[in-house]
């Protein structure tokens, strides 16, 4: 019988750093173009010597200053308290009653939440997925490291390269070009390059008006796409519900949903057929687990957005887990990136979430 006492950790201090990493394939989307991407690295130090780690992807470097300040402020409020993510999450959310529970406030909570879960798993000597009651193993993934709104003549070669990166069986293409004819041409180029057996997701990055989406999605509805992602502005749940009800291709939203209650509002509105929460907006590990319970009860599939390392652990304890979104943006600053093989990400059998910083790279990318 194991008589080891339960792991008890106490939050001591938090160290937050900002880096900016060049992208292997620049983002070209309706919401903007990016050649570099900022990251916020959070290290939660405990009095027991265990350090939990997480990173955020705030999109714009100009946003990092305010987010870092909030992380540090919230950490100071929790200093000296038990590393108990559920308790700290509730405490932080209650503190926002008068300020609101969305935007950068929830993003700061997510940074601390993920790092605390990492610390607990490390202290327990277990991979995060095992601490959560699951098992280490592969998680099927699609490759979204390209196929942005690039010139159509480049689409075929890029699709072939993306499949070859890890024998991927699924890719994501960005749509919403100047005309539906151009969207159809881009889809045809992908099919010509990789064949009909490769699953193809599509993402509009909120680039269409409701009426524009209604026209265009009906014209694309027979293309055999896995889903239409965020065709219209993310918080128009009523508009999304109308589109989802009219189309045979599943409608996917979720990366811009803030927290479990906002997630429940989307589900109650029948805003989509499937959901893909983003860990920094949904509220970290705790926010994901609560949202996944809602999705499971409703029978709605859950895919991930960004954060493939933490997300892999969570997918293996999510009842309606569907697809993990693979992006390699974190690889340049991680000491031991996760293995990608046969269209799946493989969770390493090591304590915690499995991430650690390559300090030389962090120093090189610091801003």
Which sequence ranges carry the predicted segments?
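Conserved, mostly hydrophobic/aromatic
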Residues: 11, 49, 112, 125, ...
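Metal-dependent enolase-superfamily TIM-barrel catalytic cores that perform enediolate-based chemistry
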Residues: 131-247
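Shared catalytic-loop signature of beta/alpha-barrel
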Residues: 218, 224, 235-344
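Short Pro/Gly-enriched beta-strand edge/turn motifs at strand-loop
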Residues: 20-28
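Hydrophobic faces of well-ordered beta-strands that scaffold small-molecule active sites
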Residues: 54, 141-144, 169-173, 200-204, ...
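Metal- or metallocofactor-binding catalytic centers and their adjacent structured scaffolds
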Residues: 8, 13-15, 45-123
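Short beta-strand elements
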Residues: 40-46, 338-340
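Flexible C-terminal active-site loop/helix
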Residues: 2, 6-10, 14-21, 33, ...
